[in-house]
Amino acid sequence: MLPYAEVILFLIKKHCIDCGEAFFGIVVLNALCLAGVGYSLLWHQGPGRSVLFVLVLATLYACLCAFCVVRGERGCDTLADTNLRVFTHALREVWLQSLWCALLQCVLFRTGKYVCTYYFARTHSVFTACGILSAWTYALACGALLWFVPVRARYRTHFRQCVYLSARVFFEHPCITFLMVLYSMGVLALSVPMAFLFPGPCGIVLLWQDVLRTLCFRRAWLAAHEGRKAACAPPIPWEQLMCQMRAQSRAHTVGELFSPWKS
């Protein structure tokens, strides 16, 4: 059995390879998303700014979900060959759930901002405690929604079920979610020299998708051997999952990482 440290290193290595193989798709999608977000935040100051931001956020979710759906169906090594028709079909499949997720995110932001501002503006300790509780509630809700994109791409179910599964993954694996947030912040910091075009958000979501796949594999294995004692239960066959993931990637050298079309 592979130790957990080796599994983590394998996922990080595979993430780097996947980003290299999907370089052009990642750059194009990040450019479109960043242009929309930048316009809604910096240049558009009209009365419809909130509506525009919801639409831009929904577009971001839709692009990320469609990107993951195409990757799950075709494999990361074929993303460079994916035509516009395939991606458009995936967008039509996920746009409604993405819009609901964007609306939910904005409602949470507005509500959390108003409630926290109201409570922290009071000096009484009871209001301060309520403000801290509200801030933690908002943070937990946002943390649960971090899994929405990989959950939607994997299970392809309706919105409420996706939110429920996202919250379930978050509360069952809070430490993993925290580590993923730290890793994502590090990747975003590395994206600064590339103006967040690479790896950026679309590059980060690839690892979230693989981590969710790993967690589901572990959960299914433990559920299949739930009745056995810990001493008698066979170890989790991580090698089997790693072999399946290796088959999804074809570039394994540094040269192929930045020129996958030559592999």
From Swiss-Prot:
GO terms for cellular component: plasma membrane. It is a multi-pass membrane protein. It is found in: Cell membrane. Keywords: Cell membrane, Membrane, Transmembrane, Transmembrane helix. Signal peptide: none annotated. Its main location: membrane. The chain crosses the membrane at residues 21-43, 48-70, 127-149, 186-208. This is Uncharacterized protein TP_0273. The lineage of its organism: Bacteria, Pseudomonadati, Spirochaetota, Spirochaetia, Spirochaetales.
